C-alpha cells in the first residue's frame, strides 16, 4: 500500500476505496495456457473478496481461454456438441461455479453470461455473423445459449443481477 505495507490484493482494493471485484471463469484453462480462472480459483478469489468486504461479480467466458470479439472458442471438451447439448453444458457449468462460490457463503451480486458477445459466443454454434453477413439462426442459437446460462444463474442466485456483456454497446 502507500505506506509500504504488504497487503493481500482484495484487502488493498478495499482500503483504497474499491467495493467490488469481477472474476472471470473459464471452463478448462489448463487445456490452454494457465492454471487460473477455473471454478476452484474463482471460488477462492470470491471468498477472499467477501472476507475483504467486496461485492462479487462472476464473468462466464464459456471458453478455455479469453473470449473476446476476435475469439469466442467453444471449450475443447464441448466441441462438436449439438445446440441442445451445449445448452446443458452451459447450465451445468453455471450451476457448478455458482454452487461452489455460494457454498463458501459468498453472495454473488452480478453474473455476466458471456464475455464481449457482440458476435455471439461459443463459435460456431452461437456465432451471429461472419464476413458474408448474418448467419441463419444465429440470434436464435445465441439467445438459447444465453438463456441456458441465465436460467441456471437465477436458479442458484435468484437475487443476483444477470446480464450479457456486449463490447461497443
Predicted regions and their residues:
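Aromatic-lined substrate-binding rim segments of carbohydrate-active enzymes
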Residues: 5-70, 75, 134-163
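Active-site cleft segment of glycoside hydrolase catalytic domains centered on the general acid/base Glu
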Residues: 39-40, 68-169
Amino acid at each position: 500500500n502507500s505506506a509500504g505495507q504488504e497487503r493481500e490484493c482484495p484487502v488493498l482494493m478495499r482500503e483504497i476505496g474499491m467495493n467490488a471485484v469481477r472474476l472471470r471463469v473459464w471452463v478448462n484453462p489448463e487445456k490452454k495456457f494457465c492454471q487460473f480462472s477455473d471454478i476452484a480459483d474463482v471460488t477462492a478469489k470470491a471468498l477472499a473478496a467477501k472476507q475483504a468486504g467486496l461485492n462479487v461479480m462472476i464473468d462466464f467466458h464459456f471458453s478455455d481461454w479469453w473470449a473476446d470479439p476476435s475469439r469466442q472458442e467453444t471449450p475443447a471438451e464441448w466441441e462438436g456438441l449439438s445446440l441442445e447439448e451445449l445448452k446443458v453444458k452451459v447450465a451445468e457449468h453455471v450451476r457448478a461455479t455458482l454452487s461452489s462460490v455460494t457454498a463458501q457463503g459468498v453472495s454473488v451480486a452480478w453474473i455476466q453470461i458471456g464475455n464481449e458477445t457482440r458476435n455471439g459466443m461459443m463459435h460456431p454454434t452461437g456465432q451471429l455473423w461472419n464476413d458474408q453477413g448474418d448467419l441463419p439462426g444465429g440470434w436464435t442459437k445465441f439467445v438459447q445459449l444465453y438463456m441456458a446460462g441465465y436460467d441456471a444463474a437465477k436458479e442458484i442466485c435468484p437475487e443476483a443481477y444477470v446480464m450479457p456483456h456486449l463490447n461497443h454497446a
